């Protein structure tokens, strides 16, 4: 899930629609609401956030540090002003990257993925996706590849696979996966739907790989395990 902070409801709603077309859930906040939320959100919920997108708002300068107090997810600022000085200021405030409008959400997703690669990972990461064993994921709306061949998954299953690979080495519980895929405020869908998605995903991966790469332990959660 991606959190968008902007003074304008029209902007946060627009991002929700655009990211939704790529299968990505977003939640929008005004700066005031964001302050209240980031102060009280449970640890497991904020750890499910994949990135923060900071738009035009009076508190743009202090939000990166506020986020860093709770989370290490990528922070990207959207610069509405064609000003080099403002772009440099945003980097000084502590953002990981700055994009200028107009920008496609797939470019934002690619930049998020690039920030993660620079942070370091055990999987092979490059300009064209992240490779873990025979599986390559792209995290920008494209279907994953298995042994170099495109393999389409339903949107939710694809997002779960991307999330597991992005968090390789960590065991993720059902709540974390649900929050990342559906958003932390979605009360219309039951968390148990995650088990159904993962069951279908495991069956498909097993059919392609000849083994089950998703390790599960009761009460502890799931992790992807490929030598």
From Swiss-Prot:
<dbReference type="Pfam" id="PF00486">
    <property type="entry name" value="Trans_reg_C"/>
</dbReference>
<keyword id="KW-0804">Transcription</keyword>
<dbReference type="GO" id="GO:0000976">
    <property type="term" value="F:transcription cis-regulatory region binding"/>
</dbReference>
<dbReference type="InterPro" id="IPR016032">
    <property type="entry name" value="Sig_transdc_resp-reg_C-effctor"/>
</dbReference>
<dbReference type="InterPro" id="IPR011006">
    <property type="entry name" value="CheY-like_superfamily"/>
</dbReference>
<comment type="function">
    <text>Required for transcription of flagellar genes.</text>
</comment>
<dbReference type="InterPro" id="IPR039420">
    <property type="entry name" value="WalR-like"/>
</dbReference>
<dbReference type="GO" id="GO:0006355">
    <property type="term" value="P:regulation of DNA-templated transcription"/>
</dbReference>
<dbReference type="GO" id="GO:0032993">
    <property type="term" value="C:protein-DNA complex"/>
</dbReference>
<dbReference type="InterPro" id="IPR001789">
    <property type="entry name" value="Sig_transdc_resp-reg_receiver"/>
</dbReference>
<dbReference type="InterPro" id="IPR036388">
    <property type="entry name" value="WH-like_DNA-bd_sf"/>
</dbReference>
<keyword id="KW-0805">Transcription regulation</keyword>
<dbReference type="InterPro" id="IPR001867">
    <property type="entry name" value="OmpR/PhoB-type_DNA-bd"/>
</dbReference>
<feature type="DNA-binding region" description="OmpR/PhoB-type">
    <location>
        <begin position="127"/>
        <end position="226"/>
    </location>
</feature>
<keyword id="KW-0238">DNA-binding</keyword>
<dbReference type="GO" id="GO:0005829">
    <property type="term" value="C:cytosol"/>
</dbReference>
<dbReference type="GO" id="GO:0000156">
    <property type="term" value="F:phosphorelay response regulator activity"/>
</dbReference>
<feature type="domain" description="Response regulatory">
    <location>
        <begin position="1"/>
        <end position="116"/>
    </location>
</feature>
<protein>
    <recommendedName>
        <fullName>Flagellar transcriptional regulator FtcR</fullName>
    </recommendedName>
</protein>
């Amino acid at each position: 899930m991606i959190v968008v902070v902007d003074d304008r409801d029209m902007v946060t709603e627009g991002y929700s629609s655009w990211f939704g077309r790529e299968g990505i859930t977003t939640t929008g906040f005004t700066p005031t609401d964001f302050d209240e939320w980031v102060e009280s959100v449970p640890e497991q919920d904020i750890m499910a956030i994949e990135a923060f997108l900071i738009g035009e708002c009076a508190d743009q300068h202090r939000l990166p540090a506020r986020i860093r107090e709770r989370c290490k997810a990528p922070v990207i600022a959207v610069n509405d002003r064609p000003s080099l000085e403002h772009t440099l200021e945003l980097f000084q405030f502590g953002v990981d990257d700055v994009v200028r409008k107009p920008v496609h959400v797939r470019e934002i997703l690619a930049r998020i993925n690039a920030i993660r690669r620079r942070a370091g990972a055990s999987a092979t990461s490059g300009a064209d996706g992240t490779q873990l064993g025979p599986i390559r994921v792209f995290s920008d709306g494209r279907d994953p590849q298995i042994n170099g061949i495109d393999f389409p998954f339903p949107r939710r299953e694809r997002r779960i696979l991307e999330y597991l690979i992005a968090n390789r080495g960590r065991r993720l519980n059902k709540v974390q996966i649900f929050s990342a895929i559906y958003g932390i405020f979605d009360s219309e869908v039951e968390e148990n739907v995650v088990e159904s998605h993962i069951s279908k995903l495991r069956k498909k991966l097993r059919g392609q790989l000849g083994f089950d790469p998703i390790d599960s332990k009761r009460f502890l959660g799931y992790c992807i395990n490929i030598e």
